[in-house]
Curated annotation (Swiss-Prot):
Pathway field: Amino-acid biosynthesis; L-tryptophan biosynthesis; L-tryptophan from chorismate: step 2/5
UniProt-recorded name of the protein: Anthranilate phosphoribosyltransferase
Keyword Magnesium: yes
Enzyme class: transferase
Organism field: Arthrobacter sp. (strain FB24)
Gene: trpD
Amino acid sequence: MTSQASAQAAGNTWPRLISALINGADLTADNTEWAMDTIMSGEATPSQIAGFLVALRSKGETVDEIAGLVEAMLAHANPVDIAGEKLDIVGTGGDQLNTVNISTMAALVCAGAGAKVVKHGNRASSSSSGSADVLEALGVRLDLPIERVARNAEEAGITFCFAQVFHPSFRHTAVPRRELAIPTAFNFLGPLTNPARVQASAVGVANERMAPLVAGVLAKRGSRGLVFRGSDGLDELTTTGPSTVWEIRNGEVTEQTFDPQALGIRAATVEELRGGDATANAAVVRDVLSGVAGPARDAVLLNAAAGLVAFDVDAEGTLTDRMAAALKRAEESIDSGAAAAVLEKWVALTRG
């Protein structure tokens, strides 16, 4: 029996689900898991996918609805087995601010500080340089067999799960997403569907309404970490002003405002964080890892500190206290050369 046939026997059909959404009813996680499984299996038409996404967005997604999408997407992913505690630092994109690759640099700094980082990302969609683009410009090969992706995490302390390699079934969404050309729930699934199933996440979300939902899904799935949104709309912890932070610990989500000036970080402007294409942004990565001071370094240190706070399950104290301690570790990672050494070893492993 196909997934369509078995689901119809259980009452799940596209007309039923889309009609419910149009009428303002929330779906269950089982409903959306069926929908995503059908999409990932190639059994949904572009019209059904588009209708579902638009109806879901118009009603407004819930934690359970997103959780169902995530469950099905992970079920269709190519798994990668990486032992131990793992961290992902990632932004959803979509802030339209075209900054340098802050989360990618922060990931390298966290690895230099001893965290095992499994970054999940893709090429740019709304900016000039996504994580995959800048890593390629730095010399990291992305077209690796899955076993080598896992080995890099063990030997270099960091690896990259290229979304299009690990989520091949997501190709079925390409046409309706391209033709809709609007943000949908699918724009927020990347940080929630790391195929290594990381235990800790530091996630930047530009969309103000979706940020607490992303935190809620992480909590529902038993993850820990931080979700944040800059007051300037940046999908990072911003240095231009305060950020809203949702912390996930022990299945609970707490919301607070975090001001980087409390850590002595100088206020920057968005223009000072502006990036370019992959080549230009790769040059910024090399500068930051070599110890060049300035707004880019400050933003990287702040977001690396967030990653280390997410990773360190045993740390105590207020968020500001834990961020201050983690900031010192991030500074040491750069200033000792450890972060740069991680990148050098990673490039060599992917090229060997």
